[in-house]
Amino acid sequence: MSWINRIFSKSPSSSTRKANVPEGVWTKCTSCEQVLYSEELKRNLYVCPKCGHHMRIDARERLLKLLDEGSSQEIAADLEPKDILKFKDLKKYKDRINAAQKETGEKDALITMTGTLYDMPIVVAASNFAFMGGSMGSVVGAKFVKAAEKAMEMNCPFVCFSASGGARMQEALFSLMQMAKTSAVLAQMREKGVPFISVLADPTLGGVSASFAMLGDLNIAEPKALIGFAGPRVIEQTVREKLPEGFQRSEFLLEKGAIDMIVKRSEMRQTLASVLSKLTNQPSPFVEPELISEDE
């Protein structure tokens, strides 16, 4: 090594500059890999301004951005999961719960609230994918049922945002039972004529897609969301065939009639308000343009 190389090898330039950038200031888009300013991304509801990719968004933040400011009130916030089976795989289930709670600041994978949307009363729920993949266990099922019962009590619509890998395997049959439990309460809602809208975000899979997520009076999806029971890789390995382009993405499902609408996150609030006003026979929160006759 020459003397000049030795001097430059000791220079703190690159490593120091890198260390001086606070963590979390920049975020790389998981689709186009553009480096984005995190605050701008947050203002854009975690949708990449370069390519339009819908990244995962925190469940609580999603609901607070949806509801009218100051109108939210959480439902069943005290419910916490318990390791009834003393389940252990690579780690103890209770250790996984503790780690997820520490990482997310939430007690489980579903957040439920009441509030208003353009002054319309509404009950909302959202899966937190960061909490054990948004998996559905006993607490998720119980909170979903309590939210649905609250909607029937208030006679107002219920909107649920799903982003889940499916049933929580660490709870075995207790988690599978939630599929029947959540489906049963939605049947009660239907009998009472209370609207339920399901919004499917990326990903919505397994026992969640096989139960409440696909049982909406209206099933809406975010763009390019992965929706299905088993994932595409598992299906390819099982059938040993190449799957069609875009298989299990929301655009593919809309084309095949499995969902009703695809709505961008930036347009979700207005779209839901417009749809719910029609379903509940209330005046539209938006000013409709007046039709001008040719005589005027």
Swiss-Prot record:
GO CC annotations, alphabetized: acetate CoA-transferase complex
Zn finger intervals (C4-type): 29-51
Protein name: Acetyl-coenzyme A carboxylase carboxyl transferase subunit beta
InterPro entries, alphabetized: AcCoA_carboxyl_beta (IPR034733), Acetyl_CoA_COase_Trfase_b_su (IPR000438), ClpP/crotonase-like_dom_sf (IPR029045), COA_CT_N (IPR011762), Znf-ACC (IPR041010)
Essential cofactor(s): Zn(2+)
GO molecular function, one term: ATP binding
Compartments reported by the entry: Cytoplasm
Enzyme class: transferase
Keyword ATP-binding found: yes
UniProt family annotation: Belongs to the AccD/PCCB family.
Subunit note: Acetyl-CoA carboxylase is a heterohexamer composed of biotin carboxyl carrier protein (AccB), biotin carboxylase (AccC) and two subunits each of ACCase subunit alpha (AccA) and ACCase subunit beta (AccD).
HAMAP family: AcetylCoA_CT_beta
All residue ranges annotated as the CoA carboxyltransferase N-terminal domain in the record: 25-294
Listed GO biological process terms: fatty acid biosynthetic process; malonyl-CoA biosynthetic process
Reaction catalyzed: N(6)-carboxybiotinyl-L-lysyl-[protein] + acetyl-CoA = N(6)-biotinyl-L-lysyl-[protein] + malonyl-CoA
Keyword Lyase: no
